[in-house]
C-alpha cells in the first residue's frame, strides 16, 4: 500500500512538471518577430483558430494572447541580467520599431535682441568661470547669486557721493534701483517673447486713448454690466425713471424626467419620421413670404431701371448745347410764345372765347 502511494505521488509530481513545461513551451508554425526594446511581439501566423471559433471567440483570443505573451517573456529571460538593490533587472536592447510622436517636435528657441545683434556683428560669447576670488573674504565664491563675491548688499556702511543729498537714505535708494533693474529686465523679456510671436506690445509711454464712444455703445456696455450678475440682472437696483431692459432672457423650460411617456414616445417617433422621410419638410408660410419678397424685389428693380432710363433720356444734350426734351433751361428761348405746342397754357391766356371775359384789366380803345 505504501509503495502504491509513493508511485501515485511521483506520477502526480511528473504530471504537474509536464503541465508547467507545457505552459512555458509554446509551438508556432511561424516564429514571432520580437522588438524587445519596445516589448513588442508580432504574430504572422494565420488566425485559423479564430475563424473556427464562431460568433464568440473570446476564449480563443485569451489563449492566443497568453501564448504570445509567454513567448515574449521567454525572450526577455534570455537577455543578460544584473542585480540592482536585491532585484534582478534585464537590460533591454535599443528599440527597432520607430513609434510616432504624440506631440510635434519642439520649435527652436527664438533669439533675443542681444543674440541677434551678436550674430550680426560676429560677437562670440566668452565662457566665464563660475567661481572667482573674493579678496574681502579671502576665499573662492560664486560670481553671481547667493553668497557671491563682492556682494555690496551685505555692507553695513555706504559712502555718500558728493553730488547726492546727505539726508537721503542710500540703502533705500539701492533697493529701489535694483527693483527698477528687475522690472526693466522683465519688460525686455516680454518684448523678446512678443517679437518672437510677432505680437504688438504697448509702448512704454502708456496705452493709446480710445475714440469717442457713442450713446449706443455706452448703453450696450451698461446693459451688459447690469446682466453680469449672479441673478442675470434680475435683482439689480434701477434708477427712479429708468426703463426696464429690453430683450431680457427667458428661462428655458425643460421636459420633466418622469412624465407623460406617451407624449414623449409620440415626439420621438415624429422626429424619426421627419429624419427618415426623403421629401423635405415644407413650411408653406415661409415659402409664400419668400415668393412675395422676391416678386417685390423684382418690381422694385424694374421701376428703378425705368426711372434711370427716363433720367438719361431727359438729361442728354445735343451737339449745340440744347436739351432734347424736358423743360427748357435758363438762357433758352421758348418757341411759340405762350401758346406753343410744347408748353400749353390755359385758354383764357391764349386767346378769346365766347362767353369768357378777357383777363388782365380793361382794354384800350
UniProtKB/Swiss-Prot annotation:
Domain of life the protein comes from: Eukaryota
GO molecular function per UniProt: 5S rRNA binding
Keywords from the UniProt entry: Acetylation, Citrullination, Isopeptide bond, Nucleus, Ribosome biogenesis, Ubl conjugation
Protein name in UniProt: Ribosome biogenesis regulatory protein homolog
Family per record: Belongs to the RRS1 family.
Numbered residues of crosslink Glycyl lysine isopeptide (Lys-Gly) (interchain with G-Cter in SUMO2): 154, 226, 266
Subcellular location: Nucleus, Nucleolus
Species the sequence originates in: Mus musculus
Modified residues (N-acetylmethionine): 1
Assembly and interaction partners: Component of a hexameric 5S RNP precursor complex, composed of 5S RNA, RRS1, RPF2/BXDC1, RPL5, RPL11 and HEATR3; this complex acts as a precursor for ribosome assembly.
Gene that encodes the chain: Rrs1
PANTHER family named among the record's database cross-references: RIBOSOME BIOGENESIS REGULATORY PROTEIN (PTHR17602), RIBOSOME BIOGENESIS REGULATORY PROTEIN HOMOLOG (PTHR17602:SF4)
Positions of modified residues (Citrulline): 273
Annotated spans, Disordered: 200-255, 281-365
Post-translation changes: Citrullinated by PADI4.
GO biological process terms held by the UniProt record: hematopoietic progenitor cell differentiation; mitotic metaphase chromosome alignment; protein localization to nucleolus; regulation of signal transduction by p53 class mediator; ribosomal large subunit assembly
